[in-house]
Amino acid sequence: PDNVEYIIQVNDNESLVKNINPILPSLNELLHLEALQGLQFFIQQFPKTHTEFIISAHTIGESTKLLMSCKNEERVFTNLLKHLKIDARNFTAYSDKKIYTHGTHYKKFYFTFQNGIFSVAEDIELLKNCIDRLKSRNNLLSNEDFAEIYMMIEKNPNQNWLVVNHKGYFQQAKKIINEGYYPILSTIEKNCS
Protein backbone atom coordinates (compact mmCIF):
# COMPACT_ATOMS: atom_id res chain seq x y z
CA PRO A 1 0.00 0.00 0.00
CA ASP A 2 0.97 3.63 -0.65
CA ASN A 3 0.93 4.75 2.97
CA VAL A 4 4.11 2.87 3.91
CA GLU A 5 6.42 4.44 6.50
CA TYR A 6 9.08 1.75 6.45
CA ILE A 7 9.73 -1.83 5.41
CA ILE A 8 11.72 -4.49 7.23
CA GLN A 9 12.94 -7.24 4.90
CA VAL A 10 13.54 -10.21 7.20
CA ASN A 11 15.90 -12.79 5.75
CA ASP A 12 16.93 -14.30 9.09
CA ASN A 13 14.12 -14.28 11.64
CA GLU A 14 16.19 -15.92 14.38
CA SER A 15 18.74 -13.12 14.12
CA LEU A 16 16.00 -10.48 14.06
CA VAL A 17 14.39 -11.78 17.25
CA LYS A 18 17.75 -12.16 19.02
CA ASN A 19 18.95 -8.66 18.10
CA ILE A 20 15.70 -6.76 18.44
CA ASN A 21 14.43 -8.04 21.80
CA PRO A 22 16.91 -6.11 24.01
CA ILE A 23 16.02 -2.80 22.33
CA LEU A 24 12.36 -3.47 21.56
CA PRO A 25 10.97 -0.89 24.04
CA SER A 26 12.96 1.88 22.33
CA LEU A 27 12.07 0.62 18.88
CA ASN A 28 8.40 0.58 19.84
CA GLU A 29 8.61 4.33 20.39
CA LEU A 30 10.32 4.99 17.07
CA LEU A 31 8.86 2.31 14.80
CA HIS A 32 5.55 1.35 16.46
CA LEU A 33 6.47 -2.34 16.69
CA GLU A 34 3.91 -3.19 19.38
CA ALA A 35 2.30 -5.80 17.12
CA LEU A 36 5.60 -7.49 16.24
CA GLN A 37 5.16 -10.34 18.73
CA GLY A 38 1.73 -11.09 17.27
CA LEU A 39 3.20 -11.21 13.76
CA GLN A 40 6.01 -13.43 15.05
CA PHE A 41 3.37 -15.83 16.36
CA PHE A 42 2.19 -16.43 12.78
CA ILE A 43 5.74 -16.89 11.46
CA GLN A 44 6.40 -19.49 14.16
CA GLN A 45 3.46 -21.54 12.89
CA PHE A 46 5.12 -22.07 9.50
CA PRO A 47 7.72 -24.71 8.64
CA LYS A 48 11.27 -23.58 9.40
CA THR A 49 11.94 -23.33 5.66
CA HIS A 50 9.72 -20.23 5.48
CA THR A 51 12.09 -17.69 6.96
CA GLU A 52 11.89 -14.71 4.62
CA PHE A 53 9.13 -12.17 5.07
CA ILE A 54 8.41 -8.47 4.91
CA ILE A 55 7.02 -6.33 7.70
CA SER A 56 5.75 -2.93 6.69
CA ALA A 57 4.39 -0.06 8.76
CA HIS A 58 1.53 2.02 7.38
CA THR A 59 -0.20 5.22 8.38
CA ILE A 60 -3.83 4.42 9.16
CA GLY A 61 -5.66 7.51 10.35
CA GLU A 62 -3.54 8.99 13.12
CA SER A 63 -1.66 5.80 13.98
CA THR A 64 0.85 3.36 12.55
CA LYS A 65 -0.16 -0.26 11.91
CA LEU A 66 1.91 -3.27 10.87
CA LEU A 67 1.44 -5.68 7.96
CA MET A 68 3.47 -8.83 7.39
CA SER A 69 3.60 -10.73 4.10
CA CYS A 70 5.48 -13.78 2.88
CA LYS A 71 5.38 -16.28 0.06
CA ASN A 72 3.71 -19.49 1.08
CA GLU A 73 1.93 -22.56 -0.19
CA GLU A 74 -1.80 -23.10 0.05
CA ARG A 75 -1.36 -26.35 1.99
CA VAL A 76 0.70 -24.48 4.61
CA PHE A 77 -2.10 -21.93 4.90
CA THR A 78 -4.70 -24.70 5.26
CA ASN A 79 -2.57 -26.28 8.01
CA LEU A 80 -2.38 -22.89 9.73
CA LEU A 81 -6.19 -22.67 9.83
CA LYS A 82 -6.35 -26.17 11.33
CA HIS A 83 -3.64 -25.44 13.87
CA LEU A 84 -5.38 -22.24 14.99
CA LYS A 85 -8.69 -24.14 15.12
CA ILE A 86 -10.32 -21.73 12.68
CA ASP A 87 -13.25 -23.05 10.70
CA ALA A 88 -12.40 -22.36 7.04
CA ARG A 89 -16.03 -21.31 6.55
CA ASN A 90 -15.76 -18.59 9.21
CA PHE A 91 -14.37 -15.62 7.31
CA THR A 92 -15.14 -12.10 6.19
CA ALA A 93 -15.45 -11.82 2.42
CA TYR A 94 -13.69 -8.95 0.73
CA SER A 95 -13.14 -8.54 -3.00
CA ASP A 96 -13.58 -12.30 -3.59
CA LYS A 97 -10.93 -13.06 -0.93
CA LYS A 98 -11.38 -14.55 2.54
CA ILE A 99 -10.19 -12.66 5.60
CA TYR A 100 -9.79 -14.68 8.78
CA THR A 101 -9.45 -13.34 12.32
CA HIS A 102 -7.31 -14.63 15.17
CA GLY A 103 -6.77 -13.12 18.59
CA THR A 104 -8.56 -11.96 21.69
CA HIS A 105 -10.54 -8.94 22.75
CA TYR A 106 -7.16 -7.34 23.60
CA LYS A 107 -5.55 -7.76 20.17
CA LYS A 108 -6.84 -9.21 16.92
CA PHE A 109 -5.00 -10.01 13.73
CA TYR A 110 -6.56 -10.33 10.29
CA PHE A 111 -5.03 -12.58 7.66
CA THR A 112 -5.56 -13.87 4.15
CA PHE A 113 -3.92 -15.94 1.44
CA GLN A 114 -3.90 -14.94 -2.21
CA ASN A 115 -1.74 -15.79 -5.21
CA GLY A 116 0.85 -17.59 -3.08
CA ILE A 117 1.16 -14.71 -0.60
CA PHE A 118 0.19 -14.94 3.08
CA SER A 119 -0.56 -11.55 4.64
CA VAL A 120 -1.47 -10.66 8.21
CA ALA A 121 -2.21 -7.23 9.67
CA GLU A 122 -3.31 -5.73 12.93
CA ASP A 123 -5.87 -3.60 11.07
CA ILE A 124 -8.53 -5.01 8.74
CA GLU A 125 -8.55 -1.90 6.53
CA LEU A 126 -4.81 -2.24 6.02
CA LEU A 127 -5.27 -5.87 5.01
CA LYS A 128 -8.03 -4.89 2.57
CA ASN A 129 -5.70 -2.29 1.09
CA CYS A 130 -3.05 -5.01 0.73
CA ILE A 131 -5.53 -7.29 -1.06
CA ASP A 132 -6.39 -4.50 -3.49
CA ARG A 133 -2.71 -3.73 -4.09
CA LEU A 134 -1.83 -7.38 -4.74
CA LYS A 135 -4.66 -7.59 -7.26
CA SER A 136 -3.51 -4.49 -9.11
CA ARG A 137 0.15 -5.61 -9.23
CA ASN A 138 1.02 -1.91 -8.85
CA ASN A 139 3.33 -1.85 -5.85
CA LEU A 140 6.53 -0.31 -4.55
CA LEU A 141 8.61 -2.23 -7.08
CA SER A 142 7.02 -0.09 -9.80
CA ASN A 143 8.67 2.93 -8.13
CA GLU A 144 12.12 3.32 -9.74
CA ASP A 145 13.83 4.59 -6.59
CA PHE A 146 12.54 1.74 -4.47
CA ALA A 147 13.23 -0.85 -7.18
CA GLU A 148 16.88 0.21 -7.14
CA ILE A 149 17.08 -0.20 -3.36
CA TYR A 150 15.29 -3.54 -3.54
CA MET A 151 17.82 -4.84 -6.09
CA MET A 152 20.54 -4.11 -3.53
CA ILE A 153 18.55 -5.95 -0.84
CA GLU A 154 18.17 -9.00 -3.06
CA LYS A 155 21.93 -9.08 -3.66
CA ASN A 156 22.52 -9.26 0.10
CA PRO A 157 20.09 -11.91 1.39
CA ASN A 158 22.13 -12.85 4.47
CA GLN A 159 21.01 -9.89 6.54
CA ASN A 160 17.83 -8.13 7.57
CA TRP A 161 17.05 -4.72 6.11
CA LEU A 162 15.20 -1.63 7.28
CA VAL A 163 14.13 0.69 4.46
CA VAL A 164 12.57 3.97 5.57
CA ASN A 165 10.19 5.97 3.39
CA HIS A 166 11.27 9.39 4.60
CA LYS A 167 8.11 11.04 3.24
CA GLY A 168 5.82 8.82 5.29
CA TYR A 169 7.92 8.07 8.35
CA PHE A 170 8.91 11.60 9.36
CA GLN A 171 5.33 12.86 9.24
CA GLN A 172 4.33 10.20 11.76
CA ALA A 173 7.51 10.66 13.83
CA LYS A 174 6.67 14.33 14.41
CA LYS A 175 3.55 13.21 16.26
CA ILE A 176 5.53 11.33 18.91
CA ILE A 177 8.89 13.12 19.13
CA ASN A 178 9.47 16.05 21.48
CA GLU A 179 9.25 19.36 19.58
CA GLY A 180 12.79 20.21 20.66
CA TYR A 181 14.02 17.51 18.29
CA TYR A 182 12.12 18.85 15.24
CA PRO A 183 15.18 20.72 13.84
CA ILE A 184 17.23 17.51 13.96
CA LEU A 185 14.37 15.55 12.42
CA SER A 186 14.00 18.17 9.66
CA THR A 187 17.73 18.02 8.91
CA ILE A 188 17.63 14.23 8.65
CA GLU A 189 14.52 14.39 6.47
CA LYS A 190 16.12 16.97 4.17
CA ASN A 191 19.26 14.85 3.80
CA CYS A 192 17.15 11.82 2.91
CA SER A 193 15.46 13.61 0.01
Model-derived regions: residue spans:
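A conserved glycine-rich beta-strand in the N-terminal activation segment of trypsin-fold
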Residues: 103, 107-177
